[in-house]
């Protein structure tokens, strides 16, 4: 289980806390959705989990292992991260995905590593692009390659920062379906930030609402209610029932009913 307790982080001693006492728990096989406005601390939290940022105070454990005591490479055997902004070198799609295996094989990939990459390319529908230069791909295609590279690490915790932002509807559904499959079949703990609240509600098992560097609310789908969304996003919404599913809709000015 991923366990974060009392996590604090700031960029300098004179700057305010960006993470201000974050507590979070996520079990194997669960999909946790981190929700909040831009600047609430979501990306900083993700970068702290994977080791880019070092917290000032707090603990960060996975299944009893203190992640803060691990090297970046050791932590890459447990955590993988797909950022919002992706940077690639001038490599093929195949080699880019294979580079995700470095935490496993070092610089000498074996047959098992190449088989794993081929399977991931197939799952992500990237076979036809395997020999293409990643820098020449569309933004959506690059996003899929970044996710495939993260999967190649065989992580126990997989973190997505707005993974569907550059994707068309078909590829968006592919990514979300893949997240569900990985959580269910491989018992990976998946942490995702999403801007689409209805997408989040349909996908998540647990929800973490962030504001000003703190997780203000955490829980299951019962936590996704109008009052919480209004407080976190400063937006007026209404929950409606549509064929047995809850849908979140914005309330237009003057559209309040009884």
What are these regions (language model features)?
Residues 50:
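Helix-to-loop junction immediately C-terminal to a conserved catalytic motif
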Residues 58-66:
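Conserved ABC transporter NBD signature motif
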Residues 111-129:
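Conserved ABC ATPase "signature" region
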Residues 158-162:
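Catalytic Walker B motif of ABC-type/P-loop ATPase nucleotide-binding domains
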Residues 35-37:
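The feature captures the beta-strand-to-loop junction immediately N-terminal to the Walker
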């Amino acid at each position: 289980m991923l366990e974060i307790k009392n996590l604090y982080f700031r960029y300098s001693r004179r700057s305010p806390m960006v993470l201000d006492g974050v507590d979070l728990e996520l079990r194997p096989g669960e999909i946790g959705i981190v929700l909040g406005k831009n600047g609430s601390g979501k990306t900083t939290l993700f970068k702290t989990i994977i080791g880019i940022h070092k917290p000032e105070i707090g603990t960060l454990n996975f299944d009893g292992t203190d992640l803060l005591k691990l090297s970046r490479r050791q932590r890459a055997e447990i955590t993988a991260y797909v950022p919002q902004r992706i940077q690639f070198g001038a490599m093929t799609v195949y080699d880019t995905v294979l580079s995700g295996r470095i935490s496993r094989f070092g610089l000498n990939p074996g047959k098992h590593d190449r088989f794993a990459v081929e399977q991931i390319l197939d799952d992500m529908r990237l076979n036809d692009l395997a020999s293409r230069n990643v820098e020449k791909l569309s933004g959506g295609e690059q996003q899929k390659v970044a996710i495939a590279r993260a999967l190649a690490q065989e992580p126990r915790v997989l973190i997505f920062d707005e993974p569907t932002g550059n994707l068309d509807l078909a590829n968006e559904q592919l990514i979300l379906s893949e997240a569900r499959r990985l959580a269910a079949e491989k018992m990976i703990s998946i942490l995702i930030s999403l801007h689409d609240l209805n997408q989040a509600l349909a996908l998540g098992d647990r929800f973490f609402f962030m504001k000003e560097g703190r997780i203000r609310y955490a829980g299951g789908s019962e936590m996704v209610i109008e009052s919480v969304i209004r407080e976190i996003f400063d937006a007026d919404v209404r929950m409606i029932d549509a064929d047995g599913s809850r849908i979140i809709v914005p309330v237009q000015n003057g559209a309040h009913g009884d």
